[in-house]
Amino acid sequence: MASKPRCHCKPKRLPERRAVTIVAGFKCADGIVLCADTEETFGNAKTSVPKLQVCYSSQTDHAEDLMFALAGAGNGPWVDKLVALTWAQVQTATSFDEACHLAEKSIKDAHEEYGNIFQPGMMPDAKLVYAVKMDGKSKLFSSDGPLVNEQRHFAIHGCGAELGTYIYNLMCPSWTRHTLSQLAVLAAYIVYQAKTYVPGVGGSTHLVKLRNDGGSFADFGNSDKWMEQHFQYLDGFLGPAFVASFDIDTPDFLSDAHLSELVDMLKLGRQEMKDWRDKAIEFTKVLKEQMEKRNRANYPWRYRKPESEINHDAAMPSESQKSEREP
């Protein structure tokens, strides 16, 4: 009796695990804003891990300088590996278009290389939002595995993506134009709402502004408390006013006095933000001066001039010597 042929079952792909985080990027004419939370979950344990990384070719950050920022959702070690491999290629670029091309090529090559190493269905997942700035220009990209696409306006990945997309479409209709600072506030607000309402999103808010003309700015959790307090304050104040604006049975609720009070409260909150920023700038300035003073006292050799510069300064005549020689 002939035996029946064996049935060759096609191996099933392992179920995808949903990324427990939120990473986002927003683009305007002035540049790009990237943001992310910091909470990472391992089973029942939570830890704080930076998911937004910034790489740059120069400390000066002029318009022509190269900057590369990436925020990733998914497998943490795999995201870190992609950042290292991509930056190693991008920093060799001599033009903006070449930098964008090398970033996309590096992500594809990494998935091709490591895809042959992992067993079928075991390849780690990574969804990225990254930005490239150079030569006074910038572009925003998102990737899902080896698939890379340029994004004209925004890109959001993670379990807070649906909420973030809803808030962006609500506050940024197609006919509006926002500045880089306004997009930074929007990015922080989206992460704040995701941390409040989406399980698995939490920790600090990390944010970076890549400005086309230079002067980029990174905030790794320094502004969390006061911004979240201000968001909570405005939501609680503007929400009832929004509902009351449709209450035609109580026309006196939005009288001139109430509108004036609303404007005064908004101005007060804005002034508090300015005061906090000025205090933070002054504190940072004093802290840098104190650290430099301490370092000069503890590590004087770091601030010594090379002998070539000392000999050169000694050979150059001083201003008093020049004036004495002049008739």
Task: Give, region by region, the residue ranges found by the protein language model.
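Conserved short S/T/G-enriched processing/targeting/catalytic segments and their helical context
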Residues: C7, L14-P124, G145-V185, P199, ...
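A broadly conserved detector of short glycine/acidic/proline-rich loop/turn motifs that flank catalytic sites
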Residues: T38-E39, G74, M134, R211-D213
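Short histidine
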Residues: T179, L183, V191-D219
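Long, contiguous, structured domain-core segments that constitute the functional module of a protein
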Residues: M134-G136, F141-N149
